[in-house]
Amino acid sequence: MIRSAWRIWKRFRWKNLVRVWAVFMAIALVLLAQTLGIHYGATKFTLKYMARNEAIPAQNAIMGQRATNLMLVDSSQDGVDEAEAMMKQVLLDMKVPTATVDLAKTDPDDIPSLNRYRTVLIVMPELDSLGDELVSIMRWVEGGGNMMLAMTPEKTGYLDAIGPQIGIESSAYDYVMTKGIKPARDFMLGGGHTYMFSGPFKSSLSLNLNEKATVEAVSANGHTPLIWSADVRSGRTVTCNIGIYGKVVRGFYASAFSLLGSATAYPVINSAAFYLDDFPSPVPSGDATYIKRDYGMSIADFYSKVWWPDLTKLAERYGIRFTGVMIENYGDDTKDAPVRQKDESHFSYFGGLLLKQNGEIGYHGYNHQPLVLPNTDYGDEYAYHQWPNRKAVVASLRELIAFQKSVLPAATASVYVPPSNILSKEGRQTIGRDVPEIRTIASTYLPSDSKLPYVQEFGVADDGIVEAPRIVSGGMVGDYMRLAAESELNMHFVSTHFMHPDDCLLYTSPSPRDA
């Protein structure tokens, strides 16, 4: 029988065509198996959250503890408010219980006994406000205390009096421009490299140090010491001569504070997150100009054959797990009831690829309209629409959550990224009250000129939602991005980055949707 079948096969005139057909069928079966595997793939890790009523905000965690640090400020001096606000947040995140005395409202003679504290933080440029109390502080340091000057000091008689003790050989009345900072290699993570400032100005006092000083950071040109320590008998002083204050440099001041005493330990987050905004989402149709020119393929093919394989290689090389935040459609309808997306193929395919890569799915929006009510005025900044009421906001999120479960049933999402980083007070309250599936909000960490973005601090909010802002973005590493990344790596031991899949379709980045 077998021989008979073989003779018939040999005489069959279309056998070559059958072979080709068999090859195509084999390829189809492989692709089908791969697609099914992608669709039902799930992450190999699970996220475990504390119950919302068990999560404790940082302020509550140190409330009632005895203050170990005394912060002396003089709010009547220029720039003190900004520096004080920065240091308060730094100390809160480092979990350092702090008592604050404002010399604009309190006589120096009424400063509490320094023996109650381990450290004294002086946040004022002109030390004259301390009067004779400055002498008492230096005696306390000699006996084993630790003092830090957080602001660039002004040259006065009081600075000249303590200068030799805190490592200053000589100083001038002039200030020099500090274009960047170079930490010592063993002082900070990322030390040994230079990080440039945006909008530098003459912020650092021109001075020379003596042999007591141990320099921890210098200016970009290496000429000006910016952070140094000096041992004073049994105690230690640290001086900051940066003169720039704000979120983007907190890590440098936290590192400076950690120099006080023989050792400093403080809690950090120790995590990294890499977000793919608008992913998965409806894939744009057509041919982007540069994709068509350089690759000769459609956007959909470019995503699957070039862009995603490249990201997978990066992920494998550096151990990255991407978090893709899903958007169901790019419509602008905020008034009608949500309508289910009909084309689910892109979502299940690219979402499955993400899960297969051991990534995570998050939420971005039913559409790309931020969660704001009619009382939010976009002005000339955006052409977005407002949602008519809280009920509509909840309905949009409910549809997104249901859609995610429909196309990626194996995934469990918990993080929400606001479109364009915009989230109103009412929208934020609605999430905490009515959408228990959202446990984390990842908006923006660094402030901008606009009042619309939802700017966050790392921590747990009163309603138990984790505030986990994103820090840097895009594919082009600029000076500001490097500075922010370095600072936060040393402040919270955190690295967060986000990018848009369609950034590569544009001549310039970032995307107009900007989140």
Regions found by a protein language model. Give the residues of each.
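A glycine-centered loop/beta-turn motif at secondary-structure junctions
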Residues: G64-N69, Y117, N146, S204-S271
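N-terminal Sec-pathway targeting helices
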Residues: R7-A26
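Conserved small/polar residues in nucleotide/adenosyl-binding loops
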Residues: Y507-D514
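A glycine-rich, often tryptophan-bearing local segment used as a flexible ligand/cofactor-contacting loop or short
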Residues: L127-T194
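Active-site beta->alpha N-cap acidic-glycine motif
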Residues: Y245-S255, L259-L353, Q357
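Metal-dependent polysaccharide deacetylase catalytic core of the NodB/CE4 family, i.e.
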Residues: T68-S75, V141-G143, L149-A161, E316-E426, ...
